[in-house]
């Protein structure tokens, strides 16, 4: 988009004074949208013209084969743009381009078996050239920062020639970060 209708009201400096968030979780029950990513805030190098465009990623939570998943790309893009307009995030005339990407199994499904993770990790670590990174690689609820951190740790290990992957598996194990079931 050319610009957002949201402006930076914080003391944090951002390019073009856009909101400083990398992602915004949507709590509006009147829309299906789950999360907005603002790629300009991940890195200005991810955006071709960061001074006069804002690149957004929109996440919709659905299941492979459901109505939303099967929606035609053009229809889905129009649906998403309409939701952003409804929420006041953008104006229709600011939309420059759009692309839809379906990501299978983007979020791991957490079912039975977690009591065996230690054994699974021990087994997987026997393969020197296998590095488990990100949500699906570690079958763990990592946010984007944690997922990227597992990749960075993996690169460090490969460059240094170490085969101890403890540092990779230790990303996002801080107890105070995790939500508890009540």
State the predicted function of each range.
Residues 1-74, 78-88, 123, 166-176:
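Mid-domain catalytic core of redox enzymes
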Residues 63-65, 105-106, 137-139:
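Short Gly/Pro-enriched loop/turn and capping motifs at secondary-structure junctions
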Residues 18-20, 31-45, 93-130:
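FAD/FMN-dependent oxidoreductases across multiple families
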Residues 76-94, 144-161:
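A short, terminal or domain-edge coil/loop segment
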Residues 101, 111-182:
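C-terminal lid/capping helical subdomain adjacent to the catalytic/cofactor pocket in oxidative enzymes
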């Amino acid at each position: 988009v050319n610009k957002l209708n949201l402006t930076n009201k914080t003391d944090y400096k951002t390019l073009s004074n856009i909101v400083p968030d990398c992602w915004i979780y949507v709590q509006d029950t009147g829309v299906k949208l789950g999360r907005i990513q603002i790629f300009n805030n991940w890195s200005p190098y991810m955006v071709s013209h960061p001074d006069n465009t804002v690149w957004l990623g929109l996440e919709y939570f659905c299941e492979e084969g459901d109505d939303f998943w099967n929606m035609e790309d053009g229809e889905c893009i129009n649906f998403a743009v309409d939701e952003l307009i409804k929420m006041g995030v953008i104006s229709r005339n600011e939309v420059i381009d759009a692309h839809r990407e379906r990501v299978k199994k983007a979020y791991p499904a957490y079912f039975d078996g977690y009591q065996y993770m230690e054994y699974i990790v021990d087994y997987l670590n026997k393969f020197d050239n296998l590095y488990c990174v990100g949500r699906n690689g570690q079958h763990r609820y990592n946010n984007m920062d944690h997922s990227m951190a597992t990749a960075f740790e993996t690169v460090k290990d490969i460059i240094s020639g170490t085969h101890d992957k403890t540092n990779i598996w230790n990303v996002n194990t801080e107890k105070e970060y995790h939500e508890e079931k009540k």
